[in-house]
Amino acid sequence: MHQLPKHHFLTEVGRKDRNAYFIEKGCSRTYLLIDGKEVTNWFSLEGDFTFSSNSLYHQTPGFEYVELLEESVIYSIPIPALNRLYETNIEIANWGRVIHQEVLLRMQTLRIERLSLTAKERYERFITGNPGLINRVNLGFIASYLGMTQQHLSALRADIRF
């Protein structure tokens, strides 16, 4: 168990991370640097796992950052130990498969929503699907996640009352 401060990086671009992380308390965001701008592509909350996809699946350096947005309580497991558990324990292997399926579906839904919904509809879905997160996360990160500017998000918020 690790108690880690806000702004601590669990993974960084170019670093081969050797752990997967479980968030007991706190939240994180995963982001990329694109043309010098931070683009948030994921939030992880209590009960979620987070990790560098490249490190977990290919044992290569990561292409994204995972930053804690709050003081957090994190458990870590070395990736080789996790892989051994998958190989030797069918219940854990199935649990891991289900987690990965859920994440894949969330990612696919997000991509489809970015392509097919208006900015207002994306924001409304985000609020209803992530109650309370708006009070925990910087609005700029949410705007980036939803594929809009912070100014556009602020204008939408002024027009919408939940």
PLM regions and their residue ranges:
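Regulatory nucleotide-sensing modules
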Residues: M1-Y21, K25
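Short acidic-glycine-tyrosine-enriched beta hairpin
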Residues: D35-T50
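Histidine-centered metal-chelating micro-motifs
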Residues: F9, R29, T50-S52, P61-E64, ...
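Short beta-strand segments in beta-sandwich/barrel cores
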Residues: C27-L32, D48-F49, V73-I74
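Ligand-binding loop in jelly-roll beta-barrel domains
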Residues: E38, Y57-P80, E91
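Phosphate-/nucleic-acid-contacting segments
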Residues: L117-F162
